[in-house]
Amino acid sequence: MYLLSPRNGDEEDEQEEIQELISDDEPPNLKLASCATAASSSSSSGSDMEKGRGKACGGGSTAPPPPPPSSSGKSGGGGGSNIREAAASGGGGGVWGKYFSVESLLLLVCVTASLVILPLVLPPLPPPPSMLMLVPVAMLVLLLALAFMPTTTSSSSSAGGGGGGGRNGATTGHAPYL
């Protein structure tokens, strides 16, 4: 939320002045810790160095600068996006994680369990009439016909030369499907 909240420049200047006063009165090893907090607070606004306020920690200390704070646990909203990016990049799960979600696997388990359990529970039924067996076959034929139908239709002013030839009319010279 800190990034989304409006900043007030006067409060930052007061905080930096207080930080400078505190760092001048501290012993040298505590001064390094306050310099790290002053550096992290002054890094958010680039005009501090222009105003000459960045000199509180500029003493001749030979200690290396402290490492930047780790983002684990301290970032407000960015932690979840790193996990989602790792999952989306295919970092784990292989083929199963790429093509199947948890919901689809749960549905597959439920359907499989019902297909195994229902024949055990239901009483044996007589075989259906032979005409009733034609229904799934007709549905399969209809789905195959729909799968190979062209998806776009062209107008009579297409580049294939009048008559609404579409893809087949433009390339092979044959009449359209329908």
From Swiss-Prot:
Biased composition regions of type Acidic residues, renumbered to the chain: 10-27
Example of a GO cellular component annotation carried by this entry: cytoplasm
Feature: compositional bias, Low complexity: 33-47, 169-178
Gene Ontology annotations of biological process type: cellular response to auxin stimulus; cellular response to cytokinin stimulus; positive regulation of cell growth; positive regulation of cell population proliferation; positive regulation of organ growth
Induction: By auxin (e.g. NAA) and cytokinin (e.g. 6-benzylaminopurine (6-BA)).
Domain notes: The OSR domain is sufficient to promote organ growth.
UniProt function note: Promotes both cell expansion and proliferation-dependent organ growth.
Protein name, UniProt field: Protein AUXIN-REGULATED GENE INVOLVED IN ORGAN SIZE
